[in-house]
Amino acid sequence: MNRSATFFFVIFSYLFFGTEVSKAFYSDEAEVFCNDPVEIDSALRKDYRTAFLMVYNNLPDLHGCDIKLKGKKLKTTMAARPTFFSFFRKKGKRKYVIVYNNDPDFKGVKPYDVPENARVGLFAHELMHIRDYQGLNFGGLVKRGWQYLSKRGKKNLEHRIDSMTITAGFGEGLFYWSYFVLFNSGATAEYKMFKRNTYLTPKDILNRMDETGFAVYYQFD
């Protein structure tokens, strides 16, 4: 790959992230810790700060990672990514941003509309993205951007991240998050269809939880 093509992929990776990456793009380091603390935007409501820290405190491999939460206009409720220059840094020096949507005209699910039991699943999902990024070297991060170009690639990634969330013990929160988005939120039909086609559905989540021994019993209509 020539330099111009590599630079293009890096730019794209910063904006868009994609599907599961082959093991060849993972570093030999099984677990890497960052050096700097988490930073939460003071504008984020206290109850949301509490929900985030509850999840974060139960993920010791991410403790000390340089993670910042901030508000911004997005096309989704929340998104996690490395900062641009983190592509060129060692894992222990990377910085990550979790952006929550503060656009009052957003047609999807606004963060402050999310009920308490679903916030845990939302934050856990985003922190699993960071755990995933921490397992990738430069080539893996670049390939994330390339693979994000396809709907199938994005679906594979988000299913992977949802599965990681369940395995980490946050399946119940993820279930409540997914159920709220699809059945109880004020999001548009188009946005709900996007969510249904890209992420695990509530039934999918319950099935995965049952497989991993974290079942929550819920009767669907």
Language model feature labels by segment:
Residues 5-15:
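Sec-dependent N-terminal signal peptides
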Residues 79-117, 133:
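Active-site scaffold of zinc-dependent metalloenzymes
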Residues 154, 167, 171-221:
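Long, well-structured alpha-helical subdomains associated
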